[in-house]
Amino acid sequence: MIQRMISTLVALALAALPLSAAEDQKEADRLDNCGTVLKEILDIPDNIPTDLLDKAECVIVIPSVLKAAFVIGGSYGKGAMTCRSGEHFTGPWSAPAMMRLEGGGIGFQLGGQATDFVILVMNPRGAKAILKSKVKIGADAAAAAGPKGRDAAAASDVTMRAEMLTYSRSRGLFAGVSLEGSTLRQDNGANEKLYKGNLTAEQIVRKGAVAVPPSGQEMIAFLNKKSPKNLSDPNSLKE
């Protein structure tokens, strides 16, 4: 009887291994997709202005969000966040932490095709707020639809004071978009699968607890090449 129970438990454990591996690979594939989407967006002619990217402390990418995700049972998109390393956000881009974008009026902005979102976090206060737990966009952190191309020079004071600048790409069209009312939070389950440990987003992004995983290397290498230095006013980085 005991031998049979042991055999059953071993069989169940072995059966669970492929499922666990598949879940881990799903997070790796999602992170790899974040890098692909970010590179595609930053390579288009009329994209996020370079001077804004150079002043961003963090970049968040939420790829391939479908309207159904915000209507049927779930209401969230999944992606990744990376920040400039160092005490004052002046170093190379960090290992990425997995994030979730939830609720708000996002579903009403989505069509039938997948939509990609990119969020620039423009000051340390906004970055630290996200890394603590969660942020409601527009309430806990001021946000604005980001300007694109040459529009940066003519951006309004409201836009330039925003802690987050938000963008979307859908059906080949790229534009600033309002995400007010939505919530950003760290995806602890995804981070655990990706890094094989119970790590917070702050430990991953700010504490340097892990190296960049293979699936995140394209995203981080591209950012380090595209925007190697933080060109923000040094005084604004001492919060």
Across the structure, where does each feature detected by a protein language model lie?
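Bacterial N-terminal signal peptides that target proteins for export
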Residues: 1-9
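Hydrophobic h-region of N-terminal signal peptides that target proteins for export
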Residues: 11-20
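Small-residue-enriched, tightly packed secondary-structure blocks
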Residues: 22-239
